[in-house]
């Protein structure tokens, strides 16, 4: 409407008679555009872009990539340093009697550090937080996307978990992804003198939580110590299986038969044995992560080679390379003749991790493949005096032309009756 009004005024001024003795009318004054702007409808100023609310590190990510700041390995708060030492003696006990005080925080942006987590969870009394730790890559210092926050008591941690889980993180539009940490921050897995009385529970519906799984078994078996639903590292959602630990072997044996086919939420559970894997005469040291993965030794952090098993003979190097290409730059692809397997080596470790997670159990060629970590050609194993190659201290493996592969771990999605878990082992069962 404003444009129409301006145009009509212009036409009206042109229709006025012009006197011959007078000079032509002067050109429009320079203020004319301002006059037109006055006739335009007023609009509110454009708000600043959303990303401006983020810390400066988000605006200059490349600087962080090439010159990461020196992050502290562990963040503790001096005003209750004494409390941390007073409670150290009870950490192991608390982790197994329901008094866990540490929560896992996932889906962290790379700029979210210990100070960010502390300010996010600290209420009026900062002394409720004992320690904060963001897990970082040991080579470049960048965040791995998750961390741990330890509180003074289980009640405080439980309150934070219930109140914050699913709410929006400060300065983002992303919700908090929280869960109980299986063990206190920085602690190794507790070694039990007796056998590990755990069972595998499969076919869980997506809504089954640790608490629901625990209640389902503890109502009938009082010796149940803990229950864990395995979560996807990227989405934080259930992978559809979990584990229940018992304190009594007889109750564990009964549960294997009595609970098989019993419904938990909306689905019937499938029960199987879960046996802790031991190698070289000692129990593997490590911690359960709430996302369902096992903390691994630092020696393989640079490994970028993936072993691909179950290849049919018609698959070529190019066929194998194609599905992996979308995850990042590839160094090489090799398929040993007549072995039914192959090796894909990436440039970057994160690309290899994503490919392993996404492509395991998919079809390449005509068969479903199984993926596991291989070994870079540069990291050949030393040989003993008999010519045998030593394998990784916690993975058995075989080698071919400098490449190696860990003993593949069947995916529960591929073998419905095979109870496997990163910390547990089992015997593969035949499926029709």
Curated annotation (Swiss-Prot):
<dbReference type="GO" id="GO:0005634">
    <property type="term" value="C:nucleus"/>
</dbReference>
<feature type="domain" description="RRM 2">
    <location>
        <begin position="197"/>
        <end position="276"/>
    </location>
</feature>
<feature type="domain" description="RRM 3">
    <location>
        <begin position="304"/>
        <end position="376"/>
    </location>
</feature>
<dbReference type="InterPro" id="IPR035979">
    <property type="entry name" value="RBD_domain_sf"/>
</dbReference>
<feature type="region of interest" description="Disordered">
    <location>
        <begin position="1"/>
        <end position="55"/>
    </location>
</feature>
<keyword id="KW-0539">Nucleus</keyword>
<dbReference type="GO" id="GO:0008143">
    <property type="term" value="F:poly(A) binding"/>
</dbReference>
<dbReference type="GO" id="GO:0034605">
    <property type="term" value="P:cellular response to heat"/>
</dbReference>
<feature type="compositionally biased region" description="Polar residues">
    <location>
        <begin position="277"/>
        <end position="286"/>
    </location>
</feature>
<protein>
    <recommendedName>
        <fullName>Polyadenylate-binding protein RBP47C</fullName>
    </recommendedName>
</protein>
<feature type="domain" description="RRM 1">
    <location>
        <begin position="101"/>
        <end position="183"/>
    </location>
</feature>
<dbReference type="Pfam" id="PF00076">
    <property type="entry name" value="RRM_1"/>
</dbReference>
<comment type="subunit">
    <text>Interacts with the poly(A) tail of mRNA in nucleus.</text>
</comment>
<dbReference type="InterPro" id="IPR000504">
    <property type="entry name" value="RRM_dom"/>
</dbReference>
<dbReference type="InterPro" id="IPR050825">
    <property type="entry name" value="RBM42_RBP45_47-like"/>
</dbReference>
<keyword id="KW-0694">RNA-binding</keyword>
<dbReference type="GO" id="GO:0006397">
    <property type="term" value="P:mRNA processing"/>
</dbReference>
<comment type="function">
    <text>Heterogeneous nuclear ribonucleoprotein (hnRNP)-protein binding the poly(A) tail of mRNA and probably involved in some steps of pre-mRNA maturation.</text>
</comment>
<dbReference type="InterPro" id="IPR012677">
    <property type="entry name" value="Nucleotide-bd_a/b_plait_sf"/>
</dbReference>
<dbReference type="GO" id="GO:0003729">
    <property type="term" value="F:mRNA binding"/>
</dbReference>
<keyword id="KW-0677">Repeat</keyword>
<comment type="similarity">
    <text>Belongs to the polyadenylate-binding RBP47 family.</text>
</comment>
<feature type="compositionally biased region" description="Pro residues">
    <location>
        <begin position="22"/>
        <end position="32"/>
    </location>
</feature>
<keyword id="KW-0507">mRNA processing</keyword>
<dbReference type="GO" id="GO:0010494">
    <property type="term" value="C:cytoplasmic stress granule"/>
</dbReference>
<feature type="region of interest" description="Disordered">
    <location>
        <begin position="271"/>
        <end position="293"/>
    </location>
</feature>
